[in-house]
Amino acid sequence: MSLGDAIDRVTILTRKIAFGEEGAYKEHTYLTEAISKLNIKLSGALLSAIIRVALANFEVWNRENAFRRGEEMDAEAVKRMMIEVRNFNSKRYDNKNEINRLTKLGFREFKIQHRSR
């Protein structure tokens, strides 16, 4: 697992813990302890990339949450939500790659261009 992927996962688990998902603690602890052992110097650029990953995950979560709860959404609203999620996920991948580039801990992740772009 690349550092960008580990940080991405920690941001998701942190959100789950904040909303009471007790089952997320074990993986969160494992990943945060493993990251701590890397002794990575935190630069402003790295901090910024981490925050952008967390914000992208936050936005994806917010958009998908109404759908998960079964709220009434017409086809146009679902389409709009899916496009927004795709766009935020694209930004998320870019920032995970930036984390890997800055730390030299990981690999560049490539995503296939969606035909709607």
Where do the PLM segments sit?
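Anionic, Ser/Thr-rich low-complexity intrinsically disordered regions
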Residues: M1-R117
